[in-house]
Amino acid sequence: MRDQVHRAIAIVGVGAVLPDATDAKTFWENISTGRYSISETPVDRWDPALYYDPDPKVPDKTYSKIGGWVREFNWEPLKWRLPIPPKVAEAMDRTQKWSIMSAREALLDYGYPERPLDADRTAVILGNAMAGDQHYKTALRIFFPEFTRELDTAPSFQALPEAVKRAIVEETMGQVREHFPSISEDTMPGELANIIAGRVAAVFNFHGPNFTADAACASAMAAFSAAISGLEEGDYD
């Protein structure tokens, strides 16, 4: 019995950002009412017309176009008085934003800041695989010269007048720059999976360990396991 008491882990606050639920209360209501939150892929995430084919043997396509999608969420760091400069926030993957939102909700649920906690002994341990989708968008912009180089080798493109070829490349580059994020010193920190936990720790000024566990589909369980082990060892509170 003593061992069971020693190993008990208290959940003192909860937060969530999930499909059809940008807070834990709404998520629980959705579960209670049996709400179904699986839907077709939104075009602004990835266009099924470009990437979907029902035949699983077709290369470079997916045979599924459904999933659980977080669509609209209220990201208001200035209103929440979070120390995130606008330019930094602009370069942040939505996964980092969701993590900060969930952490903020969990802290408020706990009673923070009226109910104190020891920031020096507060750890941030999250589970994530492959970060989010922001790095795909910046990669498309970065690698555009690779695509134009391959285009230059196509016989039908080579047969075009130089002015037409130049116009095609310049107009396409203009579209890429309009639709895909620019590259800055904030790009890489805004995309990396191992920055997610660090971002939460920095925003809320927590000084304990912070890291992101990546175990593919078991990332959440790996994070739980690591967090529980640290609590049991007294590494943090």
Go through each PLM region and give its residues.
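Conserved catalytic cysteine-centered active-site region
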Residues: V5-H6, W69-W80, R94, T153-A226
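Acyl-CoA/ACP chain-elongation machinery
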Residues: S39-P42, G190, N205-G208, I228-D237
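Active-site-proximal alpha-helical scaffold in enzymes
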Residues: L18, K97-R115, I196, F211-D237
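Short glycine/threonine-rich loop-to-helix capping motif typified by GTGT followed
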Residues: A129-R141, A222-S225
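ACP-dependent fatty acid/polyketide chain-elongation machinery
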Residues: M1-V88, Q96, I100, L108, ...
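Conserved small-residue
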Residues: I11-G15, I31, A103, V124, ...
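Extended hydrophobic secondary-structure segments that form protein cores and membrane-embedded regions
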Residues: R121-N128
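Flexible, glycine/charged-enriched surface loops at secondary-structure junctions
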Residues: D44, E114-D120
